[in-house]
Design a protein with these regions (language model features):
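Acidic, proline/glycine-rich intrinsically disordered inter-domain spacer in sigma factors
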Residues: 91-127
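A short, charge-rich alpha-helical start-of-domain segment used by transcription regulators
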Residues: 1-23, 33-36
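Residue-level preference for hydrophobic side chains embedded in well-ordered alpha helices
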Residues: 13, 17, 21, 42, ...
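Structural recognition of an alpha-helix C-terminal capping motif at a helix-to-coil junction
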Residues: 37-44, 48, 56-68
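DNA-recognition helix of helix-turn-helix
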Residues: 142, 148, 154-178
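Arg/Lys-rich amphipathic alpha helix in sigma70-family domain 2
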Residues: 67-86, 101, 115
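A short pre-motif secondary-structure segment
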Residues: 136-140
Length: 181
């Protein structure tokens, strides 16, 4: 059983990065449901090994656990099992009502459609990237991590992070400009 100090440390240092953990899992697994499962598993692992965390970057430590959990999950799946494209950009009436009730103005329907179409194009271009490039791009551009943090998570030298990021950006550009629309 964990001590109260371990629990408090976990809540203070690890839980604030829950969204980043889910986002990484979502991009690597291409499925919201699978990302939720893997994120929960990764959080359990992080909690179990919290006393082993002696670093100063809890986000990088957690994202490395999430990344490893994602790859373990992928390896455990049958090769023929397809990963879904996910639900990004879908209309969610409950979410729309909650935003309206909270006093947030909603964009016009045509603006929402254009934004959703743009979102789908970017997502489709990202989905076509090899996972090694996609993870680097997501960690840098979505999670806004620096090269050193990404290198620690992915367990490669900083130079490799830089070259993969450059290549990922170029491939994303090609996918976006020349990919299936």
């Amino acid at each position: 059983m964990r001590s109260d100090s371990d629990r408090a440390r976990f809540e203070r240092e690890i839980l604030p990065h829950l969204d980043a953990a889910y986002n990484l899992a979502r991009w690597l697994l291409r499925s919201s449901d699978d990302a939720e499962d893997v994120t929960q598993e990764a959080l359990l692992r992080a909690y179990k090994f919290i006393e082993g965390f002696h670093g100063d970057n809890a986000k990088a430590w957690l994202l490395r656990i999430v990344r490893n959990s994602c790859y373990t999950w992928i390896k455990s799946r049958p090769k023929t099992e397809a990963m879904s494209a996910g639900e990004e950009g879908e209309f969610d009436p409950a979410h729309e009502r909650a935003l309206a009730e909270a006093g947030h103005s909603l964009p016009a329907p045509d603006a929402r459609l254009i934004a959703a179409a743009d979102h789908q194009l970017v997502n489709a271009a990202l989905e076509r990237l090899p996972v090694a490039y996609r993870e680097i791009l997501v960690l840098r551009e979505v999670e806004e991590l620096n090269y050193k943090e990404i290198a620690a998570i992915v367990d490669v030298p900083i130079g490799t992070v830089m070259s993969r990021l450059s290549r990922a950006r170029e491939l994303l550009k090609q996918n976006f400009l020349h990919g299936d629309r």
